Amino acid sequence: MVIIGRQSAGKSTFMKVLCFCRWVEKKIMVSTDDIVNQYTHYNRFIKELKQFHRLNDEYFSKDTELLYDGDNLTIEYRGENGNAKITRKNSFAENRFNTKLCYIPAERNLISAIQNVDKTYKATERDVLFNFIYEWDEAKGPYTNEHPFRLAATGGFSYVNKSGADVLVREGGTETPAFYASSGMQSVMPMDVMANYITERVGKNASLSMHERNEINKTDNGHSYKRLEYQSAQLFIEEPEQNLYPESQKLVVMSLVRSLKKALEKGSEQSMIVVTTHSPYVMSVVNVLLAAAIVEEKNLPQSVVCKDCIISSKSISGYYIDEKGIFQNIMDNEIPMLSGNDLDGVSDWVDDSISKLNEILFA
């Protein structure tokens, strides 16, 4: 899902609320205890949403209404401060599953830009940035000298975790600590590595205690594997184009879709990536992948786009949030493509201004 809109239109706010609701659903699905009551009393749902995603009281009013329809439960919340109503669906017991979630914030480059950020970033309570720093320490573990990860950016860089230190290695072997890398590499490194790690977890054992595993095996009546192993991956990414040259933006989008496809193939449940963007290049690349998907679905031969970057056309969607905060579906089903008209309000002004100035110059 691609979300576009002007600054402060509510793109990231929507994505944060969606991510939090997905996380609450995951927690309830996986838990061996009945924890629904924990999130329907003492204003806990709204308190944790505000705390984790750093949303203050100004984001909520008496007219606020949140309605979440998930895979196996629904969440309803209304007003400024109150309790959520959480309802399990009829098929909850047999259909619940484990999923791996990750919110990749715009501030991700702090991982590289600040030395020892895990020690210097102080938060009174666990928030989205603190959590990302914590998850980064887990995610980078597998990418050692023996298993470097090729980054989706121009320049031929690979990421290597050298005894905990983040290092970028060029094709010729030259090493650069991430702290001294360009802003583009500092932005793409944690996003690309994290996306690869999270999607690679699908089909593998989930992080559960032995007690939790035993309890799940006792109660799940043949469905225990769906909670013991990750069945899907869900990524929420703010501005994947951040600090990147257009060619690198293309490589990043294709890398994300490539990772998503692997997760879709390995999992029994639907994996997804949600991104917010201001980039026409990101939109254009998504449209190329959409066109390639339709060609594949019609069984027509093509060699334009690698098959490992092609997912179902039905998996691709896009929305524009207008100045009133209303979502507009930007999928044009006739062509089909995601319309970028609302993203590019400058081109008409440029063309008109150049035309008028040329008239003055060459009159």
Language-model regions: role of each:
Residues 232, 269-274:
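Loop/turn-to-beta-strand initiation segments
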Residues 245-246:
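Conserved D-loop-proximal element of ABC-family nucleotide-binding domains
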Residues 240-242:
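Conserved Walker B
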Residues 272, 284-319:
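Conserved catalytic segment of ABC-fold P-loop ATPases
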Residues 2-46, 183-198, 254-255, 272, ...:
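Phosphate-binding glycine-rich loops of NTP-binding sites
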Residues 91-96, 257-261, 291-292:
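Short, surface-exposed basic-aromatic patches at helix termini and helix-loop junctions that form
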Residues 224, 250-266:
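Helical segment within the ABC ATPase nucleotide-binding domain
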Residues 22-237, 307-313, 317, 324-363:
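Phosphate-coordinating catalytic segments in nucleotide- and nucleic-acid-processing enzymes
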